[in-house]
Amino acid sequence: MDTPTSSSLPAIERQHLPALFAARPTDAHKGSCGTLGVIGGGPGMVGAALLAARAGLKVGAGKVLVGLVADTPPLPCDPMQPELMLRDFRGLLEAGLGIDAWTAGCGCGMDALAANALSELFQLRGDAALVLDADGLNLLAAGAVQARWGDAPVVLTPHPAEAGRLLGLSTEAVQADRPGAARALAARYGAWIVLKGAGSIVCDPAGACRINRTGNPGLATAGTGDVLAGILGSLLAQRIAPEQAVPGAVWLHGAAADALVTHGVGPIGLTAGELADSARRLRNSRA
């Protein structure tokens, strides 16, 4: 959504994202490719965490571990992606498995267990980057968790309604000045901001904004935000600097949807689960 305040922003361009398309070293191994931890997937929403985790794996993380927000994980493994390692969130947080970046909040729910999971993560994550999405943002807005997350990079990924909750504004006010809302969030939380929507805004912690021009209405379906959060966490886990990883993830997510539509998959009926394979193809292209 372009407004007078966003139409003049510089656009995110593929040629400005060399780290996304660099060749992988011949001596790479799963440890050198980064480990992503995903915290989410409360009752009835396990799919959200799995969408994020699958996307993280398919855009290049060496390992992806999932901590479900449940006392007992409802699944022993992901039958569609058995490479993912599933456990309950406490088991993951206490395992000390050398997580390089975290994606948290996808489908975690709004109950006390979810708030405890995120609070424990904020305390234990050390120097690992953090992507906070979905219910994680709603818990933050409600005061159920506190923004005590240290100096390592943090990325918040609100849609306009979530941004409004975080700022105490209406969705309409956020949409009327999307760059202003993104800058206000960056200043309030000392974080990178991805304000999602048509023409997503990426804002760094200092308030510099860019607009994304990739993507299409096929993304207007459940789970696409979880996929974006997984891509973001994965690129950060691969030790790509936030200056490349954050705009790069947003560009890649939209470009993956565009590539699917070009091949007749959508926009009507495009599903979130189809994005990760498309994003993988793009990362491996050199065009």
UniProtKB/Swiss-Prot annotation:
Requisite cofactors: Mg(2+)
Name of the protein: ADP-dependent (S)-NAD(P)H-hydrate dehydratase
Taxonomic path: Bacteria, Pseudomonadati, Pseudomonadota, Betaproteobacteria, Burkholderiales
Membrane-spanning ranges: none
Highest taxon, organism lineage: Bacteria
Gene source species: Bordetella pertussis (strain Tohama I / ATCC BAA-589 / NCTC 13251)
Binding site for AMP: 196-200, 225
Family named by the database record: Belongs to the NnrD/CARKD family.
Keyword entries, A-Z: ATP-binding, Lyase, NAD, NADP, Nucleotide-binding
Subunit structure: Homotetramer.
List of residues binding (6S)-NADPHX: 48, 109, 159, 226
Gene name of the record: nnrD
Function: Catalyzes the dehydration of the S-form of NAD(P)HX at the expense of ADP, which is converted to AMP. Together with NAD(P)HX epimerase, which catalyzes the epimerization of the S- and R-forms, the enzyme allows the repair of both epimers of NAD(P)HX, a damaged form of NAD(P)H that is a result of enzymatic or heat-dependent hydration.
A Pfam family hit: Carb_kinase
Entry EC no(s): 4.2.1.136
UniProt domain YjeF C-terminal: residue ranges: 13-286
Family matches, as InterPro entries: Carbohydrate_kinase_pred_CS, CARKD, Ribokinase-like
Cystine bridges: none
Molecular functions per Gene Ontology: ADP-dependent NAD(P)H-hydrate dehydratase activity; ATP binding; NAD(P)HX epimerase activity
Reaction equations catalysed: (6S)-NADHX + ADP = AMP + phosphate + NADH + H(+); (6S)-NADPHX + ADP = AMP + phosphate + NADPH + H(+)
Classification via HAMAP family: NADHX_dehydratase
GO biological process, one term: metabolite repair
